[in-house]
Each structure stands twice: as C-alpha cells, then as structure tokens.
C-alpha cells in the first residue's frame, strides 16, 4: 500500500423496522408550498434576500421540512455566505472577476454581450439551487449565514427565484 495505512471505519447499526413519518395522530400530513420572488438587481453583485425568505417560511406554518430555493436563470446564481462583514461578498465578487474575466477572445458565445458568457461560467461554478432544513418554522441557517442572489451581468435584471417548502 505504498506506506499508506488502512483506516478502519466505524460500523453503524441500522434501525430495524419501518421508518414512519407521522404526526401525533398517526397520519402523515406533508404540505408542499411554493412562492416566487422577483429580485431586481442593479447589475453585478451579491444581493441578500434572507429576510424575504424567512418571512415566507414563517407564514407557511410548516414546523419541520426542507426548503428548496431555485434561481430561474443561467447568468445568475445563489450562494449562502457570511452576512456579518460586507467585505466577504465584495471579495467573493472580486475573485470571480479575476478567475472568469470578461472580453476573453476564446469565448464563442458573444451574441448577448461580452459579459454573458462569463456570467454563464460563474453561474456554473456556483449554484442555481439551495436546500435548507426548516426546524421550528425557521430556516436552520448558521448564525452568520445569509442567502444571496449572485448577479453576474452588468446591466440591471429582474430575477425569478422559486421557493418550494415541503414538510409538516
């Protein structure tokens, strides 16, 4: 094994019997709710929208579940990032400017502007959907976590964000 040591993994026991997902009365009452947000951007940057999502989740009367957040675009994305220090999101945006520059002569897709293909690449390197647990009618985000729309185009845009909550 070329000097490598085998690591023995701990064994886990599976619970025997069926897994039940029921409320106190014994019946399963899983709800599914959806909502669409429109976020208007002023061009490139990270736009926080944790508050809007939190208000909607609280209004849904779902104690425990999973929230999916989906960006309906290919030139914008979603990130969960620190929300305490604004320099974090500025540094993140600056990093993507350096890693995926505009006006690269190797880009073939240029019909929608010189910022479009880099926007697609940046969106591919991040995420267009997020999944967040919901407990106690609240998103189970960490203390310093916020949800951001990451706009990758220079011009103002209207971005559709679909929220889907499933739980009981």
State what each model feature region is.
Residues 1-28:
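N-terminal amphipathic/basic-hydrophobic helices that include classical n-h-c signal peptides
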Residues 19-168:
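Active-site histidine-anchored catalytic micro-motif
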């Amino acid at each position: 094994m070329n000097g490598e040591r085998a690591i023995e993994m701990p064994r886990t026991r599976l619970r025997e019997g069926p897994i039940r997902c029921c409320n106190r009365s014994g019946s399963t009452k899983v709800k599914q709710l959806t909502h669409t947000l429109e976020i208007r951007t002023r061009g490139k940057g990270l736009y926080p929208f944790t508050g809007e999502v939190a208000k909607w989740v609280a209004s849904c009367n779902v104690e425990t579940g999973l929230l999916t957040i989906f960006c309906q675009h290919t030139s914008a994305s979603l990130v969960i990032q620190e929300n305490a220090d604004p320099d974090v999101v500025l540094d993140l945006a600056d990093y993507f400017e350096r890693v995926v520059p505009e006006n690269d002569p190797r880009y073939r897709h240029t019909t929608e502007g010189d910022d479009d293909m880099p926007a697609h690449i940046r969106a591919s390197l991040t995420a267009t959907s997020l999944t967040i647990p919901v407990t106690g009618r609240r998103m189970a985000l960490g203390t310093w976590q916020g949800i951001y729309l990451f706009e990758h185009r220079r011009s103002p845009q209207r971005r559709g964000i679909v929220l889907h909550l499933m739980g009981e």
